Amino acid sequence: MLVMNIENFPPEILANISGFLTDKEFILLTTIDRFFYGLKKINKLKNPYDFKTIRTIIDEYLFSHLIIDSTDLFDILSKYNINTITLSDNFNGDIKMFYSLPNLNKIHVGLNYTDVDSITGIPDKIINKKEIILTLVSNKIAFDTYSKSLKRLEKKNFLKHTYPQIYNWESIYKIINKHFRIVFNALGKNFDSFTYKESYNLVKLILLFTDPKYKNVLTEYFSKFEILHKYQVLKFHPELRQCITKKNYHLPNFIKENSVIVKEFIYDIKFIHNHKFLYLKNTYEKIIKQHGFNNVNEYRDFLVKLNTHK
């Protein structure tokens, strides 16, 4: 209906309407209406676009978000005033060079990017600075935790493959999620009002990410990134471990005194927990598909049959 009566609308109305259109609708209208054609170099497209697929039309429209796989595109990003970039899973350059782009204010990193040192100097103009840091920390922890197991998964001789560990890892992921659910349901309360169960689960989560005996330890990153400096108060504390072993009902005073920081920390480690499993799941499924299986269940069934007929 909009297309049929488009000439009856005054320009100011059309300009307002253009802001509510999807990219697909806007692009279609630029091909059939003179007014919208004139907006091609005024209105920015909203969705992310892979540079490889739009390189031939990059001069026709204004793009705000590009998916890139190389630092070789620096000049292009600068020329076209790109606001957001997403680094593809194949990206392995140094993202520091992008910080100087005048209009760039957001960067999304892929699951395979683990160069933590490349993000120590992210400028404040990057509005998702903390998200980038947490994502790379998650990627690095996941890589360090699972890389050896995933390497064994790449072996072509299936007789050397074991029952898919992904099921065990997923079970652990879900168990930890139960701790998070209990704590999140209680975070609206004052710590003095926490029940024993809520206190226990809160301490358990903090220890999972600060106690050196676990693989998720974040303490080395507390000093590396300024935005995480506040969490140094949560560096491993003997009092925390005692709280678990002695089943002390009350939370340690240093937890109560830093309640705002503790609550923010819980949200951040939940992000890391989820992203770490996302890295594992995506990488595992990618390797499985390279072996010719559609999913993990199909791979598992194959191994069961293979071991049955040894």
UniProtKB/Swiss-Prot annotation:
* Classification of source organism: Viruses, Varidnaviria, Bamfordvirae, Nucleocytoviricota, Megaviricetes
Its source organism is Acanthamoeba polyphaga mimivirus (APMV)
- The protein's name in its UniProt record: Uncharacterized protein L75
